[in-house]
Amino acid sequence: MLNSYGGVSLHEQSHGESFMALFTNRLKNKGLYIFDEPEAALSYMNQLRFLVWMKEAVNAGSQIIISTHSPVILAYPDAEIFVAEDGILKTTSYDDCYIYRDMLAFVTNKDLVIKELLSDPTR
């Protein structure tokens, strides 16, 4: 059984490491994979590793559907991106997607965003 997860017990790994062990060791066959916010368990670096796993899965003939708030996972090349607006799914590009734009705004204006968020609204 341990060989199915890379030879290490899932209980001896962090949450993110156990997720990556599942992806890389158990989900190898061609299939349809559906994930709901996999980034919740994955560090930034493991999100990058997840992109590599996605490429390997797609190259093996798999299809992957992901609900995500991660600009890293959203950046998968040639991904078809949908956003829900007023209960309707609409296609969008990476650069136009609010997930990317919001993260970019934070990263490029971190100090201002933090100042505004943590300011005393009673002053």
Q: What are the roles of these predicted feature ranges?
A:
Residues 45-63, 70-123:
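C-terminal lobe/lid and adjacent interdomain/linker elements of RecA-like ASCE P-loop ATPase modules
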Residues 5, 13-37, 45-57:
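GG-anchored amphipathic helix commonly corresponding to the ABC/SMC/Rad50 NBD signature/C-loop
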Residues 1-11, 98-101:
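Coupling/switch segment of ABC-type P-loop NTPase heads
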Residues 34-36, 63-68:
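Structural recognition of the conserved hydrophobic beta-strand(s) that form the central parallel beta-sheet
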Residues 2-4, 15-16, 62-65:
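Short amphipathic alpha-helical surface micro-motifs
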